């Protein structure tokens, strides 16, 4: 199993704070039943980071956060 590192994700979302927000929101979506965009048997937080590192999810997650 390949390990996901913050550096892998920072290549896609350079700002650490935006990365955390995007990963958190995506993990919440996954835990509520949304379909994963990659094949994964991991917990929602790890799956969200894997999606970001793979380029399947990005800053568009922040535009979906309700005000």
From Swiss-Prot:
SUPFAM superfamilies: RPB6/omega subunit-like (SSF63562)
GO cellular component terms, semicolon-separated: DNA-directed RNA polymerase complex
EC number per UniProt: 2.7.7.6
Alphabetical UniProt keywords: DNA-directed RNA polymerase, Nucleotidyltransferase, Transcription, Transferase
Catalysed reaction, written as an equation: RNA(n) + a ribonucleoside 5'-triphosphate = RNA(n+1) + diphosphate
UniProt GO molecular function: DNA binding; DNA-directed RNA polymerase activity
Enzyme class, spelled out: transferase
UniProt cross-references to InterPro entries, sorted A to Z: DNA-dir_RNA_pol_omega (IPR003716), Pol_omega/Rpo6/RPB6 (IPR006110), RPB6/omega-like_sf (IPR036161)
Xref: SMART domains: RNA_pol_Rpb6 (SM01409)
Single Gene Ontology BP annotation: DNA-templated transcription
Quaternary context: The RNAP catalytic core consists of 2 alpha, 1 beta, 1 beta' and 1 omega subunit. When a sigma factor is associated with the core the holoenzyme is formed, which can initiate transcription.
Its biological purpose: Promotes RNA polymerase assembly. Latches the N- and C-terminal regions of the beta' subunit thereby facilitating its interaction with the beta and alpha subunits.
NCBIfam families registered for this protein in UniProt: rpoZ
Similarity comment text for this entry: Belongs to the RNA polymerase subunit omega family.
HAMAP family according to UniProt: RNApol_bact_RpoZ
Name of the featured protein: DNA-directed RNA polymerase subunit omega
Taxonomic placement: Bacteria, Pseudomonadati, Pseudomonadota, Betaproteobacteria, Burkholderiales
